[in-house]
Amino acid sequence: MNISIITFTENGTKLAEKIRQAFVGTKTEEAKKLGLSLSDWTRQQFAEKNAIVVIGACGIAVRMIAPFVSDKLSDSPVVVADEAGTFVIPLLSGHMGGANELAEQIAGQIGGIPVITTATDVNHTFSVDLFAKKCGLSIYNREGIAKVSAKILDGKTPDIVISSEKTDLEQGVLGLQPREYIL
C-alpha cells in the first residue's frame, strides 16, 4: 500500500516523520509546500489509489475527500490522526481499503489510540467484506454487504453465495466470486 501523509502544522510534520519510519516509501507533504491545490493533491492520491493520512482535524479531511468519494469497494483508504498523535481514526474504506488496519498500525507506531467505529469490528463479529478481501473474492452485488452485515450483527444466519459465475440472487443474499482461479 502506498501511503501519502498531508500535514498542516509543524507538530503535524513531526508526527508524520514518526509514522514514516514505520512505513517504507511513505510520502509526507506539507500543505503549504504542495505546489498545487489541496483539491488537486487529493484528486491525485485517489487516482493513484494511495492511502491518505491526514494529520489534522476530521473536518479538514472530510472537506478534502468529499468530492472524490465514490464507492466503498474502491475508494482510497483515509486515516486521520490529531497532531498530538492521541487518536488515529480510519475515516474511509475501513475494511476493503485497509484503513482500519492502517489506523491500528499507525497508532501502534506513535503510541496513539485507534478509533475503530465499524459495527462488525466494535461488536467483534464476522465482517463479510473483510472476509472477501482476505480470501481474494470480489463482491458482485454490493447491496448485499449491508444486509448480510445487519443479519450477522442481529445474531441471524446470513445468506452468502460463493460461485465462479455471477448468479441472480434473492434480496439480502451476498454474492462473492473468486478474482482468479489457480489450477
Regions found by a protein language model. Give the residues of each.
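Short coil/turn connectors at secondary-structure junctions
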Residues: M1-N2, E48-A51, L73-S76, E83-T86, ...
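N-terminal basic/disordered segments at the start of proteins
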Residues: M1-T28
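Short glycine/serine/threonine-rich phosphate/pyrophosphate-binding segments
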Residues: G12-L15, I60-M64, A99
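Short, solvent-exposed amphipathic alpha-helical segments in soluble enzyme
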Residues: K18-V24, P67-L73, M96, F131-A132, ...
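General beta-strand structural signal in soluble alpha/beta enzymes
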Residues: K27-L34, V53-G56, V80-A81, P114-T118, ...
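Short, structured active-site "lid" loops
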Residues: W41-A61
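Short, acidic/small-residue loops that bind anionic groups at enzyme active sites
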Residues: V69-G94, E101-Q105, Q109-T117
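Internal alpha/beta core interface subdomains
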Residues: M96-L183
